[in-house]
Design a protein with these regions (language model features):
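Short nucleic-acid-contacting surface segments enriched for D/E, G, S/T with interspersed K/R
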Residues: 27-64, 156-178
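Short, contiguous, well-structured surface segments enriched in hydrophobic/aromatic residues
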Residues: 1-41
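Structural detector for short beta-strands of small beta-barrel domains
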Residues: 1, 7-13, 103-131
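A cross-kingdom feature that marks long, compositionally biased intrinsically disordered regions
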Residues: 222-278
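OB-fold/S1-family single-stranded nucleic acid-binding modules
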Residues: 54, 59-104, 180-243
């Protein structure tokens, strides 16, 4: 289990992690797993990395990953809440010699999304944020399991389009969306003038992680129809998700109970040297 961090731009600022839970050396048919081989070569240093070898000597890879969720329950102010964090989950990893010249194609995502709400968020000049729309709903993995997600829209025309869809929990909109993953840390510089001598320079790191929609189908899919997705199928998928969340909660409760039990065991008494008390 671990992450493969990919720099998607030449300046190595936008770093997109890809999570691998478990990768086997062979496929189900008994053949060598090419992805396992590539990952092992990276770990063993046979393929260069930016951190170890520098950007010029780092290996180039192409990854066909899938959107997944890292989900767990967290205690916040005495209340247990579900935390769902989007991430790139697994996929096929290929070594390549060349990359597409347009960096905008290096960190893309595509998904069929059932949209249930769109909210406008005003930007904050002091924090360096701009106006955007938050598109909420769900996507589906290869097992057709529900993955609740939200994406951003920063383009003005795009914001107007999604806000105008009128999507709601009673009247969802099913469509294809695509966009780019932003995962970068930049330094904000503040300069204070001095009455004399050197100025005071402060640098503050600012991290931005977002999944930004840059386009969508001209026409949404037909909702609640055979060949698309029906309300009955969605209801069944929602029931399956509740079962899945219950299993996460159970595992977490069992883990907490085992830790509490271990902490409650008194330490073994230390026998004094030269005495034998049975």
């Amino acid at each position: 289990m671990g992450n493969l961090n990919i720099a998607t731009d030449n300046d190595c600022i936008n770093i997109v992690p890809v999570h691998f839970t478990y990768v086997t050396a062979t496929t189900s048919k008994g053949n060598a797993n090419a992805t396992f081989g590539v990952l092992k070569d990276i770990i063993d240093g046979k393929v260069g990395t930016v951190m170890t070898n520098g950007a010029d000597k780092a290996g180039k890879v192409r990854i066909d990953s899938a959107i997944g969720l890292n989900e767990f329950y967290s205690d916040r102010n005495g209340t247990e809440e579900l935390v769902s964090v989007k991430r790139n989950e697994g996929g096929f990893v290929h070594i390549t010699n060349t990359l597409a010249p347009d960096e905008k194609t290096h960190n893309t995502f595509t998904a069929d999304m059932l949209i249930t709400s769109v909210t406008q968020i005003d930007g904050d000049e002091e924090k360096g944020t701009k106006d955007k729309a938050i598109v909420r709903g769900c996507i589906f993995d290869f097992r057709k399991a529900i993955l609740p997600v939200e994406f951003s829209v920063t383009n003005g025309r795009g914001m107007d389009y999604f806000l105008g869809l009128g999507a709601s929990t009673k009247e969802p909109v099913f469509t294809k969306v695509w966009g780019r993953q932003i995962s970068q840390t930049t330094m904000d510089k503040t300069i204070e003038e001095s009455a004399w001598g050197e100025t005071l320079v402060r640098e503050t790191p600012r991290t931005r992680r977002d999944w930004v929609i840059t386009g969508s189908n001209p026409e949404p899919y037909v909702w609640d129809e055979e060949g698309s997705i029906t309300a009955a199928e969605l209801t069944e998928a929602m029931a399956d998700r509740e079962t899945y969340l219950a299993s996460i909660k159970k595992r977490q409760d069992e883990y907490k109970a085992s830790k509490a039990a271990a902490a409650a065991v008194p330490p073994a008494a230390t026998q004094e040297k030269g005495t034998f008390v049975f």
